[in-house]
Structure formats: structure tokens, C-alpha cells
Amino acid sequence: MSGVMDSGASDYQLEAAISKVFASENAWFVTDEAIQILAGMGYMKDCGIEKVMRDLRIFRIFEGTNDILRLFVALTGIQYAGGHLRELQKAVKDPISNFGVVFGEVAKRGKSSLGIGAGNALGEMVHPNLNDVAAQVCKNTEMFGNSVEKLLIKHGKQIIGEQFLLNRLAAAAIDIYATTCMLSRCTQSLNEQRPSAMHEELVTRAWANEANMRIAQNLGALKNPVQLDTFKMLSQISQNVCENNAPVQGNPLGI
């Protein structure tokens, strides 16, 4: 995030939103794990962790709640894809004059359907040790773009109300961005031959492996019939509770 600002970029609200969500949620997770390890001692003032946890909790609310920022992250990506689809729609109406645009899009989608991606666009930017991780980031980015386009084609402007889907999109985007940041940091360490470089590569690979699984799961949920049906059920459950202004089911003890 600091690197983006230092580069002179004037628009970094998306990166800022992702960084805020990622940092605040992971800081909470790490502190919670620390208290779990310390057991009862974690609650003692002398230890100091309980104060850290108390203060950290507000960060998921300050400067925009993380729930709202997740929607912002997803909708920002959708806004870009929507603009691309509108341009393509105009081109299709006059294919002769816009042959290059239409042909390029057909070729791109044809390659995608055959499993031929855009390649490793990050290959020249990362240390050779990390080429395979960078290639997976590119693949995940392409999967993300395809998922966004399919959602837009299916839901159109109504996508803004599909918050279960948007939340999965945001989670995938955050994981992709976080992995890219780790690649950048680790590449610098490897290039400068820092003493911690090999350890940082290990951390980067471990993170990327887990992130890849989460990304596949979140993007897969957007087209999984069982998952989509579950989203509808959860939406109906929420509606029932709101209409009842209380849990719908009675107390199991009959009280």
C-alpha cells in the first residue's frame, strides 16, 4: 500500500480498503491465537495482550466497517468489468467497424474455454524462485475476472443486492491482492539476499497455497448449485427473523 502511494498513484482507494480489511482481521486473529496459547494468563493485565485485543476490536469498525468495505471491493471490480462489457456490447452492434475488438474478445474467450490462460504476466517482475507462485496469481486473477463477467451477465444491475455473492468475490480479491503483496516483499528480500530471504519464501509459499484453496472455494461457490441454494435459504432465514423481530423457533425448554 505504501509503495502504491510512493509511486505517485492518485487513486488507491481499492488498495486501501483491501489493506484495512486484511490488516484489521488478521491482527484480531493473531491476538486471539496469542491469548489462546497463553490460556488464563492472557486475561491478566500484566501480560498486556488483553488490552491489545480490546483496542484491536474497534479497527474492524473504524474508517468504514469491514462488511461495507468488502462490498466496496467487490463492486469496484464489477464496475470495471461492467464498463468493459458495455464497450463490447457496442462493438457487437457494429462488428464490421469494430472487428478487432470483437475478434480479440472471441479469441480471449476461446482460449479461456480451452484452459489456455493469459500466461504469467508477473513472471518478469518476481524473483525466478517465485515464478510458479506468480503464475498461479495470474490464473486466479483470470478466474476472478471470468467470475465477475458471468455474474454481471446473469444478474445485471441487480448484482448490488446479491451480497452473499459479493462477499465471496471480495474474499477472493483480498486473497489475490495479499498474495501479490507477499510476492513483491519476498522478491525484494531474495534480490537483496537478505538473511531472512529463504524463510520469507517459505512463508510466501505457505500463504499462497492456502490462499489458492480459499480463492477456488469462494469463486466456485458463485456457480455451485448447492451453494447458491444455500444462499437463498440463508436469505429467507434472515427475512423470517427480521419479520418476526426475534428468533422464529421457540425455546427448546418451553420457557
Model-based region annotation:
Residues 1-255:
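Flavin-dependent oxidoreductase catalytic core characteristic
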